[in-house]
Regions:
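Small beta-barrel nucleic-acid-binding modules, primarily SNase/OB-fold domains
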Residues: 2-5, 15-145
Length: 145
């Protein structure tokens, strides 16, 4: 009797603890505040506590776009194109969803970002406005400049 009671308690407690650690992996962005460059923007995510989800910097996972304050004219020009592309996509979207949230070394949220079911990273890559990035050394946008 004691053993079966113990087994029931263990099964119940493990299922409760598994449920309490399950966090949603997809969040709807309630407001786009600003788009700094092609891979970084600020947003509100009402599903998260204010300390985490209010005016939070989000960096798009898996890509790097040129820097607005780049090292050469080519990089700065491409940076403006990437930023404008991201602005148009995010501000004109019916829905923006962030998935697979992580933190980077600057405490920004890293996420896969979708606008109207289109992955923003893929769209930027397809338009030549981003390169794949895994957190190592960044590519130079100023080659042959």
């Amino acid at each position: 009797m004691k053993i079966s009671y113990l087994v029931i308690v263990l099964i119940f407690s493990s299922s409760v603890s598994a449920q309490s650690t399950n966090q949603p992996s997809d969040y709807i962005v309630s407001e786009i505040i600003s788009v700094y460059d092609g891979d970084t923007f600020r947003a509100n995510i009402n599903e998260l506590p204010d300390i985490v989800g209010k005016n939070v910097a989000i960096r798009i996972l898996g890509i790097d776009t040129p820097e607005i304050k780049g090292k050469c004219k080519k990089e700065k020009t491409l940076a403006i194109k990437a930023r404008d592309f991201a602005r148009k996509a995010l501000f004109n979207a019916e829905v923006v969803i962030v998935k697979n949230l992580k933190r980077d070394k600057y405490f920004r949220l890293l996420a896969d970002v979708y606008f109207d079911n289109t992955k923003l990273a893929s769209a930027l890559l397809e338009n030549g406005l981003a390169v794949s990035y895994s957190g190592k050394k960044k590519s130079s946008w100023c080659k042959n400049d």
